[in-house]
């Protein structure tokens, strides 16, 4: 574990200390990977990636396991989702990567619109353009009547990716 210098722009893995569990029940491998000791201090590594801003605040980027690689650039779905969810027509959104012959993956937004709302891809991209780099903008927009979430309320990226692939005829 090495701290990240504030304002450096370096992406690192979030680490937490304090009241940390002893481990996962009957899962020593996962416990070893998640809970580490360094200099007598116990740390938890939940799997989230983050940067430290110049003012010392932490910017959560999301989990590396759902990171989209498009043209060698990393896109964290949660970052794009937070911008999309600010659009007045969007009730909820998940962002996934689908295969792209040129870029490796392309960004797809799976969105649930508010009742009576309409939204086209161009308008969604224009809205996002104010806050996101061009490579992070959704290249496809898949509209659904509701977004699936896990029993714990977490984003179901597997469902969103399958839905996007089916909708885009992959």
PLM segments and residue spans:
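Short, solvent-exposed helix-helix connector turns and helix-capping sites enriched
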Residues: 5-6, 26-27, 156
